[in-house]
Amino acid sequence: MNEVDIFVIDEFYKLSFKNKTSEKYYDERVISLNVALSKLLTVSKQFYMIGPNIDFLRGLNNINEDFIFLSSDFNTVALNIFEYNILPNNESLKQSTTLSIIEKNNGQFIIYCKSPKVAESIASFLIKSGVSSDTNEEEYSLWLEKYYSQFWVYTKAIRHGIGLHYGTLPRAIQQYTIDLFNNKKVNILICTSTIIEGVNTNAQHVIIYDNRDGNNSIDKFTHNNIKGRAGRMKQHFIGNVHCLEESPEGKIEDSIVEIPIGLQDNTTPLNLIAGMQDEHVSSLSEDRLEEYLSANRLPKEIIKKHASYEINKVLELFNEIDWLKDSEISDLCFQRYPDKKAMNQISKNLLITSRQTFTRNSVSTEIEHISGMLFSYINAETHQTYFDSQLSRIINSQISEPEISELINRELKIIRNVFSYSIPKSLALQQDIINFICQKRKLNLTADYSFIINIFEKFHLPGNISALEEMGVPLQILQKINFPDDAIVDINKCIGYIKNVYFLNKTLSRLERKFIERALII
């Protein structure tokens, strides 16, 4: 991509590092976004960046002076704010207050909470309290029971007219839930931070149940962003926001967006510097990076290609692989399937790059467990056969229904965060380091991990088919369709083929056709 007419970044505040206890913290998404911004600024004739509640912008003028910044406090709807000042850990009072708000008001409700676990807890409480409405979506409920279980809280919630929305849900389920809400088939939508990440809804009432995102407090900026989900121009001209906890205090810093690539100093991550375009790298940053590279043996091209990784993790992985004997390097230079010895080393390498991800997603950090988990997924016939085996194990383990639901969510987290993201990302880095070392040692060997990377990244689907999952076609449908070779390599032909299946295949159920309709706008 060498020439672009215009690029647009929505929610551009995500370019800025967040502050926790007044210190910057590392966020690989911020790194990746800034690397992309640096590239786009060098190839695009124009740019347009949009975001809410932003009063000041810092850093952009240091790398591009040709722009106009406009700050506006214009609102398309009026908001009524109700404060309840409930203590954060008083769950029983927050639950009863939420129920009271729902019972006393008509219309639709979005409930923001800190985590999927809390979302399920709220849903279960509302169901037990008799909150229910008919969605007329029996076919969807049966589909959920077939592929995910009747014990899953999401399934139970849908049957009672309550929707759940959080990041680890399959894309098709996320998008279908929003459709049900916007079409008023579901009147209550319980969300995590996905509510402010591109989800378009039209609720009259917003209940801010928690002032946290995970374990971290949300600032005034994020709080205002959530409030902004109440009301909708031409539908609800007045929105109602119910803040259960005391609202966070506003600071001037909350409305400032800092662009890291334009504010380089001694704290700028070295991997961000390596990933930036040369014309955006300051002399200070250039000296820091060169000093680091000369003191260590890391090749700059690998750091640049894998800029989202902290540079010390890349160095640790490089040293781990470089310590291996030639025969051990040879074991890692497979083309399709690894043997047990290679998989154990890959698992060890994964702990260097992704230990926090494993821990955060409740994955054991025992080498044998990781190796067995990877083999189980790689050797499964399809993504669904793997998930079905996990589901069967969970349901037959003689535990309570809430525990079953919690373990189903854990499996979905592992699939979304570990299998389809962290593992293929780490494998690509491992492959490049191995091949660099082979070249350095003059070994006539090559590691090619593309086969297993695709298995994880694309849910066992060939070529570009997995892109349709991101668009909202469930994997369960995609696995049924035999795509021709040209459709596998060309996304436009892939979309054209599935449209033909939609029009000509009489075996698709009404629900399956509906999924395809909404994803491909048929």
What are these regions (language model features)?
Residues K14-T21, F56, E197, R232:
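Residues immediately C-terminal
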Residues V4-V8, I188-R212, N224, G239-L244:
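A short beta-strand element within the Helicase C-terminal
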